[in-house]
Amino acid sequence: MRPTHAQPPLLRVNVLLFLLLTCAAGVWAQSKPIEPCEPAAAPTPAAPKCPDKAATRASKTLIDDNIPADPEVEKLLAPYSSKVHELSVVIGTLSGQLKRSLVGSGSMGNFVADALKSQATKKNKSIVVAITNGGGMRKISIEPGPLHTSDIFELLPFENALITVDLTGAQLLKLLENVTRAHDAQSGARIQFRWNAQDRPEFIRAKLIDSAGHESEIDPAGTYTIVTIDYLYKLNSGNYALLRDGKNMTPLNLTLRDAVIDHVKSETAAGRPIRAQTDDRFQQIGPGPSRPIEIR
């Protein structure tokens, strides 16, 4: 008879072998790549069912003065109707064509800048120069004849407010140089310029000019008050960045458009027509540009 103590080692071997095979199977299962499941096909939408026949009915109604007014609609339009009526009011008579052109924005620029200076000076007597940008004038020309409020709204559609700024004479000269280069408008100075080889206006010199036409030198160390629009002041870049270097910026609580309208009404009340000024506030020295230049 075999001794009974030899059986346990054989049993342990079998158990260990079973455990090893089980672990190997688990490792093989983990290393096997998982096949992706095929997505289920989307159901085909059912075709919409349309009726075999469709019936439509149309009617025609003539809209003319025989249709009674709707009180609710009239109430809704009333505030706007009064504004439209204001736009159609004749505020003056234009004696010649106003037109934008190159340097200084032409007679249109002179008209706007002169009106700006005229009305702003009523609020601040120390103003010597008015400046505004030609790009803010949205009409190329206005023909002679009755001048309506709507003409000014079309010309100046933006809510640009007037401000005054104190500049040194050196800053003012630099500003007038930038005005010349940008084809913008000014009132209160006489500027000499030439056309350079790139067909761009090049500033030479400038002097102040009063309402009687008398010239005076600009002292680089002096202090001068100008009026312009808040849009140019807020730009803080390009031709008008130096406005931020000025002192005592003061709002005048008046928009450019209202200043022009008030100027026209004031001239009309005084019995004077609105003239298209083409004076020598911009004096060209030498020949003009070598090619046609588009006005934008």
Predicted stretch roles:
Residues 84-103, 156, 239-245:
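Acidic/histidine-rich, surface-exposed loop or edge segments in extracytoplasmic proteins
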Residues 25-29:
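Sec/Tat signal peptide C-region and signal peptidase I cleavage site
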Residues 74-75:
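Polar, low-complexity export/assembly segments characteristic of proteins
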Residues 31-69, 106, 110-296:
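Feature captures C-terminal
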